[in-house]
């Protein structure tokens, strides 16, 4: 008798995606982050759903409703901190996942890569709107500053900002629509994840060597399911430790002060996972230039496949490119640090140097070094 998982219309889709899927035998732990991201998304949707049952998206009650969740709802504090710190875990996994794609040349699967960039933008938008919902000082001023950036768009900028706000400032209408979109977007992200997987399974997985692995494939289950479960356990242990021991480690103390339009915090800054982009934005003295640099800091990933001129796909056997990659990581960490510092000497100049380096590595150094490696290998 044929196994039901191979004949049932629904089960055979799951079977071909997670059970009998042929996978390269050499995948390292860097390939765990896809499944970890799926786990993060599931945790975020579940905790978010339960939080939404108690949250009110009204400027008069939003802050108090979050306090009520933490104080009066059974395990409300756990839900709230799982959701807040789950977002941090989500972005850690996201950035490592993208870094893996850059290092091992996975971006040559252009459809999968482009859907991945769309996913990155969607998750960033979701996280930004979620940060506004507790209606603390940093929520309000973060929303004001970031939405105001759209006013740099010529001709339609000011109208666009007022249209997004639903008035002449960030107020009740803004909070209500941000809650609506924050609730909706994770489901759109889930749909995009399906498309991401669909494109991935069209080509099959890349592997650390970057060479075709057709002659050496193994079934996804049990080999990689067990590996993924270990990844889940490690991530959930880290998340639980963060939630139970220092839930406010990655948050901003200013967000425990209710939003006050008459009092600006001394340093307005976003959550830590946006600081690198915020530093790039601040390093350009022109408003429109800053906004373009901010968008390009992520969108530059879309042109990475076009700039790939190396004869080898992965960086595994390209030591010069490896040095550049780790320089890029160092630059990103520097930008993250600068984004959290006040706008004064020497932070401004460090941020500007790091921003220029960030774009130079992608646009100039990577192609140059690839060409040099090709020449050294006489290709």
Swiss-Prot record:
Binding site for a ubiquinone: 201
Keyword NADP (UniProt): no
The entry's keywords: Electron transport, Heme, Iron, Membrane, Metal-binding, Mitochondrion, Mitochondrion inner membrane, Respiratory chain, Transmembrane, Transmembrane helix, Transport, Ubiquinone
Cofactor: heme b
Cellular-component GO terms for this entry: mitochondrial inner membrane; respiratory chain complex III
Record's signal peptide: none
GO molecular function: metal ion binding; ubiquinol-cytochrome-c reductase activity
Transmembrane spans: 33-53, 77-98, 113-133, 178-198, 226-246, 288-308, 320-340, 347-367
Gene Ontology process terms (BP): mitochondrial electron transport, ubiquinol to cytochrome c
Binding-site residues for heme b b562, renumbered to this chain: 83, 182
Annotated heme b b566 binding sites: 97, 196
Localization: Mitochondrion inner membrane
Primary site of residence: mitochondrion
Cross-referenced Pfam families: Cytochrom_B_C (PF00032), Cytochrome_B (PF00033)
Cofactor stoichiometry and binding remark: Binds 2 heme b groups non-covalently.
Membrane-topology annotation of the record: Multi-pass membrane protein
Extra facts: Heme 1 (or BL or b562) is low-potential and absorbs at about 562 nm, and heme 2 (or BH or b566) is high-potential and absorbs at about 566 nm.
Self-association state and partner proteins as the record states: The cytochrome bc1 complex contains 11 subunits: 3 respiratory subunits (MT-CYB, CYC1 and UQCRFS1), 2 core proteins (UQCRC1 and UQCRC2) and 6 low-molecular weight proteins (UQCRH/QCR6, UQCRB/QCR7, UQCRQ/QCR8, UQCR10/QCR9, UQCR11/QCR10 and a cleavage product of UQCRFS1). This cytochrome bc1 complex then forms a dimer.
Family listed: Belongs to the cytochrome b family.
Function description: Component of the ubiquinol-cytochrome c reductase complex (complex III or cytochrome b-c1 complex) that is part of the mitochondrial respiratory chain. The b-c1 complex mediates electron transfer from ubiquinol to cytochrome c. Contributes to the generation of a proton gradient across the mitochondrial membrane that is then used for ATP synthesis.
UniProt protein name: Cytochrome b
Gene name for this UniProt entry: MT-CYB
């Amino acid at each position: 008798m044929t196994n039901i998982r191979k004949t049932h219309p629904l089960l055979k889709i799951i079977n071909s995606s997670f059970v009998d899927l042929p996978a390269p035998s050499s995948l390292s732990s860097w390939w765990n982050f896809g499944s970890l991201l799926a786990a993060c998304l599931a945790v975020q949707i579940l905790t978010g759903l339960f939080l939404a049952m108690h949250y009110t998206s009204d400027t008069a009650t939003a802050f108090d409703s979050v306090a009520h969740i933490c104080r009066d709802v059974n395990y409300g504090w756990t839900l709230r901190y799982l959701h807040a710190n789950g977002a941090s875990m989500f972005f850690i996994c996201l950035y490592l996942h993208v870094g893996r794609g850059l290092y091992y040349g996975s971006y040559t699967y252009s459809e999968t890569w482009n859907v991945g960039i769309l996913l990155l933008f969607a998750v960033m938008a979701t996280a930004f709107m979620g940060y506004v919902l507790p209606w603390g000082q940093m929520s309000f001023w973060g929303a004001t500053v970031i939405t105001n950036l759209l006013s740099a768009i010529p001709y339609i900028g000011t109208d666009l900002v007022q249209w997004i706000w639903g008035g002449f400032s960030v107020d009740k209408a803004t909070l209500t629509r941000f809650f609506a979109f924050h609730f909706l977007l994770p489901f759109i992200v889930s749909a995009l994840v399906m498309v991401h997987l669909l494109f991935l399974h069209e080509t099959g997985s890349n592997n650390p060597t970057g060479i075709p692995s057709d002659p050496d494939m193994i079934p996804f289950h049990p080999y990689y399911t067990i590996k993924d479960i270990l990844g889940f356990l490690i991530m959930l242990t880290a998340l639980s430790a963060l939630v139970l021991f220092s839930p406010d480690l990655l948050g901003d103390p200013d967000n425990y002060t209710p939003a006050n339009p008459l009092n600006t915090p001394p340093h307005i800054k976003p959550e830590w996972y946006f600081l690198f982009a915020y530093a790039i934005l601040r390093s350009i003295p022109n408003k429109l230039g800053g906004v373009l640099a901010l968008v390009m800091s992520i969108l530059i990933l879309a042109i990475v496949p076009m700039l790939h001129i190396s004869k080898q796909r992965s960086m595994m056997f390209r030591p010069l490119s490896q040095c550049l990659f780790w320089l890029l990581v160092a630059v990103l960490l520097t930008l993250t640090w600068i984004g959290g510092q006040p706008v004064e000497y020497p932070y401004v100049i460090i941020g500007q140097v790091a921003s220029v380096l960030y774009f130079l590595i992608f646009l100039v150094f990577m192609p140059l070094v690839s060409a040099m490696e090709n020449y050294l290998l006489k290709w």
